[in-house]
Regions:
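CN hydrolase (nitrilase-like) catalytic-core segments centered on the catalytic cysteine
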Residues: 63-78, 162-243
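Extreme N-terminal starter segment of soluble prokaryotic enzymes
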Residues: 1-5
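Active-site catalytic loop in hydrolytic enzyme cores
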Residues: 70, 90, 94-173, 187-188, ...
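Cys-nucleophile CN-hydrolase/nitrilase-fold catalytic domain and related Cys-dependent amidase chemistry
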Residues: 15, 24-114, 120, 186-189, ...
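Structural motif
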Residues: 35-36, 151-153, 177
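Short, acidic, Ser/Thr-enriched surface-loop or helix-capping motifs
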Residues: 14, 111-113, 222, 229-230
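A short acidic/small-residue loop/turn micro-motif
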Residues: 124-127, 240-244
Length: 268
């Protein structure tokens, strides 16, 4: 599977512009042969635009998802619609299974190239340190996976990277690739270099850590989106500017590495 990480530029609370950039990145990635394109955390509004969360919240299948789904179908490519701020009440009214019937969640949706929804993941670990996320949002409860391009794919979001037990649970359910939409800021750039790589090494799987690019009143995003292979080797990486990076991620590589170095079999 050819995985593209779309490190799009994000403007605070400018939904239409941000989604247009995302659609453009999907088109570019598909033209370069991508099978799956991953977008960053809250790419449509900006993670640090906390004052806009309620105003720009959408149900699953709302405006942002409709536009991203249409791009996936048009360009024949699977798309992880990063995350958006989900209006749980509106989703519940539309018949979606939700962790609460009111409030907001930080929600990722994976569409396949036919536009079918394959996975919905709501961020489990909400960030409270110098962030309003933990005050504003409802955490998710489920750890879904989906079959895509020969991989068993899961999604975790940004701060989830600091909780390795989450990834071990995913390995136990057969996961071979984890996509990590993020809004990682300075000054914790060294943590961003370390944590996705550590999760790949520990669990002998692919990690696609996709960050945004842009500046907010309280933080600047570090960019540096990277695909790590099951040895933890960076096989595609960016700097901090808006760009798309792509890597071939053959599922058989996971099998090869786990057979060559069967550390997962030695757990006690």
């Amino acid at each position: 599977m050819n995985l593209a990480l779309a490190q799009v530029g994000i403007e605070p609370a400018k939904r239409d512009r941000n989604v247009r950039r995302a659609v453009g990145a999907i088109e570019s990635a598909a033209a370069e042969g991508a099978d799956c394109v991953a977008l960053p955390e809250i790419f449509n509004a900006g993670y640090f635009a906390f004052d806009a969360y309620e105003r720009l919240a959408e149900p699953i299948g709302g405006e942002t998802h409709r536009r991203i789904r249409a791009a996936a179908v048009e360009h024949d490519v699977a798309v992880l619609a990063g995350t958006v701020v989900e209006d749980l009440a509106a989703s519940a009214a539309a018949g979606e299974s939700v962790p609460a019937t009111a409030g907001l969640s930080n929600t990722a949706v994976l569409f396949d190239s036919d536009g079918d929804r394959r996975l919905v993941y709501r961020k489990r670990h909400l960030f409270g340190y110098d962030s309003a996320e933990a005050e504003l949002l409802v955490p998710g409860e489920r750890l879904p996976t989906a079959e895509l391009g020969g991989h068993t794919v899961a999604v975790t979001t940004c701060y989830d990277l600091r909780f390795p037990e989450l990834y071990r649970r995913l390995v136990e359910s057969g996961t071979t690739m984890v996509l990590v939409p993020s809004a990682w800021p300075y000054p914790r750039v060294e943590h961003w270099r370390l944590l996705p790589r550590a999760r790949a090494v520990e669990n002998l799987l692919y990690v696609g850590a996709v960050n945004g690019s842009g500046s907010f009143e309280t933080a600047d995003l570090v960019g540096r989106s990277t695909v790590y292979d099951p040895w933890g080797t960076p096989v595609a990486a960016s700097d901090e500017g808006a760009t798309v990076v792509q890597a071939n991620c053959p599922p058989e590589r996971v099998t090869e590495v786990r057979e060559e170095f069967p550390a997962l079999d030695d757990r006690r």
